[in-house]
Amino acid sequence: MGDCFDAQDIATGKYLNGINEAIEYYFGIEPYKTYKDYFNIYTIVGMSPDSGMGTVNTIREAKFGSQYGLQASGSVGVDENICFEYACEAPTVTENSICETPIVLVENTYEYDGITYMWGDGSAIALCPMSQDIYPYDYRG
């Protein structure tokens, strides 16, 4: 899934290009490269009203609630309930299996601040910014 992508980002292909790049990077490293065929990969589109990620000083509306600095830690925050709800739109994901489904949320920003939120039942949401850098400075490194 991606967040902070508006209608224009989706129409021009920026959204899908960002998602495909993230999938390529993720499965370009071991052990995921070897075991890629064992994964079901789905893209869920959630259109945001605004393009780009907001900050404490520049609030932008995002479908999944992504914002910089609104958490107590100062890190990127997200609305996990909406993320889980949308992830359940994938053909093989249910409320019962969401704890076995890693969710990667590609953020429409080039600011580095990736973080993963994990819960005791095994549920996880990884927030990954887009990358303009080459390896090993991109988000593979």
Q: Where are the model-predicted features located?
A:
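Propeptide-to-catalytic entry region of secreted or membrane-anchored zinc metalloproteases
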Residues: 1-99, 106-109
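Nuclease catalytic cores that cleave nucleic-acid phosphodiester bonds
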Residues: 104, 111-114, 121, 126
